[in-house]
Structure formats: C-alpha cells, structure tokens
Amino acid sequence: MIRHIAPLALLLLCATPALAQVAATPTPTAPAAMPDQPKPTVVRVALQTTLGTIEIEVETERAPITAGNFLRYVDGKRLDGTTFYRAVKVQEGFGLIQAGVRNDAKRVLPNIAHEPTTKTGLSHTTGTISMARAAPGTASGDFFITVGDMTSMDAHPDQPGDNLGFAAFGKVVSGMDVVGRILDAPKSPTEGEGVMKGQMLAPTIAIVTARRVKTPPPAPVTPPAL
C-alpha cells in the first residue's frame, strides 16, 4: 500500500504561498525502545469543538517557543470561535486537519521563530499538533493535527532546499475519534486555491473554547507480585 504524501508539504498554510519543500513519502516506523526517563513538563489543553472535545498535551519543556505561542492564544481566548477549516484525507486513516485564526487581525499575534524537530526531539507521528507555516519563522496562529505517521514533516537537514520541516509541539491524548470525524467531514469541491482546492471544510467545524485543563496525576505503579 503506497502512502503518497508529497502534496502535504504544500498545503499547510491558510492564504499563503505553498512551501518549496516537497515531503518524502512517509512510511510507518516503530518507535525505538528508550530507557525510562522523567516525563517532560506538559500542559494539557482542551479544544471543545462542535463535534466533540480534543485534549492535547503541549510540550512546554521540549518546544518552549512554539508551545508558549500556542498557550498565548489559548490564555487570551484568541482561539475561541475560530474553526477547523481544512481537512486533507490522503487515504483512510491518513491525512491532517487544520485550524486557527487565519490571519484575523483581531486575533493574530506576531510570528515566532521556527523550532525544528531536530531541536525539540519531537516527531510527526499520529496525533501530533504542529504549526502551519510558509517560510521558517512565519508561523503564528494556525496549526494542524496529523492522522497517521508523517515523519516526512520532521526536519531533514540532509535534504536540499527548505529542510527544516514543521514545528511539532504536542500530542493528542484524548479525542482522536473527533479528529477522525473532522477529517471525514464534508468539503467544498470549489473553495480553496491551488493545492487547497477541494480541501476546505464546508461547513467549517467551530472551536467553541480552548482552555487549559488539569493534567491527570500519573497512574500508581503496581509492584510485581512476589
């Protein structure tokens, strides 16, 4: 089964030029076994949408610039009333959904520095939340969530051109069923320009609120039976 993802490197910004980068075809990869380590600091955010709630753990320690930017939008209630407006379904269970402020002058904050995955150690596995951008350093208030492993969106310094990838900054921990419903939602056959034509949700899916929520305490460790 071939999972062709080349167009995805071109579709991640709203009303901005497409990226020059062409992503390679991703292949599912099993995570390497790692020794037990303290879990990095995270902040949990709930996106309440009209199709259900998506909870995300935002990596404030590993991706401080990008996570801090997202939390400024959350804490300022700038995402309340915005929408998931785009869904790209490459094949069943594989694609992405995009949301954000869409350059709304009343909501948008200044662009942030690009924080590549080579710096954060994060990767675009399924359920990753990451920033939409054109050139590096142009990300602001639009983001996407992956469905399926898309490690071609990570930084690849050994490749030519714009090889810095996208800035992942968290992971969906609850509500991937909602993400899937948004991915499958109806799209307009005529809206959108260029590669985005046919990818615009119609109707859009509203983000009613975006709020910090308490992170559940870790589950108690059960000692092995003697």
Where in this protein do the model-derived segments appear?
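Cyclophilin-like peptidyl-prolyl cis-trans isomerases
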Residues: 2, 20-226
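Bacterial N-terminal signal peptides
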Residues: 5-17
